[in-house]
């Protein structure tokens, strides 16, 4: 299937013990890690609602009696716009923090279901945010679609950029140096 990383979508869901989807959210992948052992792992995404994909994912889960977290990898075929579901991982995704940053903490519906033993309304991650693990300049270098690039710049300018490694309250010099080196390592990896 042709298309760069931006044709990929990530969908995160939680199906409670009653069989109801109580958490749903999605993101457009902007850039994936290109290291051989990390291929397919997004390093930058924009949260975005994809109602048709949400319906399909929810139907797939509920029609098959699924329970728990699910993370879907979906690619949009640029030739005809069809969504192709590649896989469903029976766990929360590595990059699930995008859900909390977009307003839907994945732990809340799970705790309400399994600990509090109560039903909850469906939570949807609908706030538009940029989740990224790479420097902005590196990310923007790899986005070739000008409209998408402008959108990313706007989100950054509006302060809706989230990198879970960058915490302004962290004052430990060693930790901050490690994070800085990790960011530089991304530059090295993508330059190969």
Question: Positions of the model-derived regions?
Answer:
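Phosphate-binding site of ATP-dependent enzymes
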Residues: 1-35, 48-55, 76, 82-84
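Predominant activation on well-ordered alpha-helical scaffold segments within soluble catalytic domains
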Residues: 12, 58, 107-111
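Glycine-rich phosphate/pyrophosphate-binding beta-alpha loops
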Residues: 30-42, 89-103
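Oxyanion-binding "anion nests"
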Residues: 34-42, 46-74
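Short, conserved loop/turn and helix-capping segments at secondary-structure boundaries
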Residues: 47, 51, 100-105
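Feature representing long, continuous alpha-helical segments
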Residues: 55, 86, 105-109
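Conserved metal-phosphate-binding beta-hairpin within the catalytic cores
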Residues: 61-97
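Peripheral (often C-terminal) accessory segments that flank ATP-dependent C-N-forming ligase machineries
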Residues: 108, 112-192
